[in-house]
Amino acid sequence: DLLGLHRSVSVEARRLIQEATGIPPQNVLISATHTHSAGTALGKNRYVNEQELDNYQRFVARRIADGVRCAVNALRPAEIAYGTIDVPEHVFNRRWRMREGSVKPNPFGKTDGVQTNPPVASPDLVEPAGPTDPAVSILAVREPGGRLICVYCAYGLHYIGGTGPAHISADYYGMFCEALKRLQPAAHQPGGDAAPPFVAMLANGTSGDINNIDRLHPRPGRKPYEQMRDVAEDMAQKVNAAL
């Protein structure tokens, strides 16, 4: 759970994974979340393709590789399934076409026809500048004919925010994982080598233009964590129903 992950961290993690397990880099997919209430592994200059890693980036790469090594050590026969469900009620395009003359000139002296994060319920709103993607992609793995081992999901929604002051938080991604685990009997079985714990994961899908704010309908103020918890619980219920 990070603000962002630089390509160089991913490259180093793949190298360490191959070194520890023999899995070639081209067989490794690394995904992340995007939260403004966590640290960053983007480094000093996120805009370069290659960079020397700082101490935190090296730590992140090592922990990614450690996670893969632990998974390899717990390998067992499994069945895999995949699918999608639509959860459209939480995703809104934050790029809006605005009434002509309502947008201030940009730094280059020209006027954009589209504004990012315009004021909620502004009379200058015309229409969203693009679509949303309501799909929650689901990848589920279980023991043959038995208990779930893990569920990996992706959803095209920015972080939600609304934490306490200076709090570190995995945002709705972390809350979704905890909610889904509570709904799974496999998560409550005894641990040990015979039954590794159920793992739930949620990745950030393509969501550069998408957030959780309905620009047309103002939402009453909410307590810290309340909105992200509502979204996470709702998503977990719907994913669980689809499993």
Q: At which residue positions do the language-model features occur?
A:
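Long, well-ordered mid-to-C-terminal structural blocks that present hydrophobic/aromatic surfaces
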Residues: V231-A241
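Conserved beta-alpha junction segments in alpha/beta enzyme cores
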Residues: D1-V199, A203-D209, I213-D230, L243
